[in-house]
Amino acid sequence: MGRVNDKVVLVTGGAMGMGLTHCTLLAREGATVYLSDMNEELGHQAVAEIRRQGGKAHFLHLDVTNENHWTGAVDTILAESDRLDALVNNAGILTLKPVQDTSNEEWDRIFEINVRSVFLGTRAVIEPMRKAHKGCIVNVSSIYGLVGAPGAAAYEASKGAVRLFTKACAVDLAPFNIRVNSVHPGVIATPMTQQILDAPQSARALLGPTLLGRAAQPMEVSQAVLFLVSDEASFVHGSELVVDGGYTAN
C-alpha cells in the first residue's frame, strides 16, 4: 500500500475495462485519481465505488480528441489539486479489419482516438509538469505496436505510432525531468475483447502464440502502469514495458 501516496494522476478512458482497473489500483495505492471518460454515468459510478473503498477520485468528462476539453481538464485539476504528477493515456478503440477492407473513415477514426488523443494529452500536461520540474506520462500501446498480426492494420499502425511517439517525447521532455514510457499489453480479458475471446477460432489465434496460454487480467497490466507512475520507476524513461505472457518471445 502507498506506492503512489499523494500523487495526482489523470487517467483517460477510466470508466470501464482496463482504465477502471488502473484507476482503482492507483487510488488503492494512495493517489488522487482523476478518472476521465465520455460516459458520465459509468464514470460517476466508478468514482463512487473507488471512494466507497476509501480511495480519492474525481470524475472529468473528457473527449480525448478535443483540445479544449484537455485544456479544461488540466485547468480543473490544477485548480483543485495544485499540480498534476502523472498522465495515463489509456483511452483507445479496436477495429478488426484487414487493410484492404478498411475505409478512410475507419482509419481516421482509429488514429483520432488512439494517436491524436495521446498527442493532445501529452502536450496539455507538459507546462504544469515543466514548472514542477517533474512528471510522468504513461502511454498504453499494445504488443501490436511491436509486431504485426492479420486483420487489424489500422489498430496496429496506431499503436505503433504511440510507441514511437513515446520515444520522441522521452527525448524532448527529458530536460524537464518528465519521464515518458509505454506499456504494451498482450491479449487482455476486457469488455472490448470478450466477444473475440468467446469465439473459439479467434481465441485460438490470439492465445496460441501466448506462451502462458491465457489472456491477461486487467490488474496484471495495471500493476505495470502503477510501477511506471511510482517513484520506483524514477530511472525508467523512454522504455517499453511489455506485459504479454510471452507472446512476443514466441
Swiss-Prot record:
> Which superkingdom, per the lineage?
Bacteria
MF GO annotations: cyclohexanol dehydrogenase activity; cyclopentanol dehydrogenase activity
Return the NCBIfam families for the record.
PRK07231.1
Q: What is this protein called?
A: Cyclopentanol dehydrogenase
The answer to whether UniProt assigns keyword NAD to this entry is: yes
* PANTHER family noted in UniProt: DIHYDROANTICAPSIN 7-DEHYDROGENASE (PTHR43477:SF1)
Taxonomic classification: Bacteria, Pseudomonadati, Pseudomonadota, Betaproteobacteria, Burkholderiales
Gene of origin? cpnA
Q: Which EC number(s) does UniProt give? A: 1.1.1.163, 1.1.1.245
Function, please?
Catalyzes the oxidation of cyclopentanol to cyclopentanone and cyclohexanol to cyclohexanone. The activity toward cyclohexanol is 60% that of cyclopentanol.
Q: Where does NAD(+) bind?
A: 18, 37, 63-64, 90, 155, 159, 188, 190, 193
Catalytic activity annotated for this protein?
Answer: cyclopentanol + NAD(+) = cyclopentanone + NADH + H(+); cyclohexanol + NAD(+) = cyclohexanone + NADH + H(+)
Instruction: Give the pathway.
Output: Alcohol metabolism; cyclopentanol degradation; 5-valerolactone from cyclopentanol: step 1/2
Q: Which family does it belong to?
A: Belongs to the short-chain dehydrogenases/reductases (SDR) family.
Which species expresses this protein natively? Comamonas sp. (strain NCIMB 9872)
Question: Coiled-coil intervals in this record?
Answer: none
Q: Which UniProt keywords apply?
A: NAD, Oxidoreductase
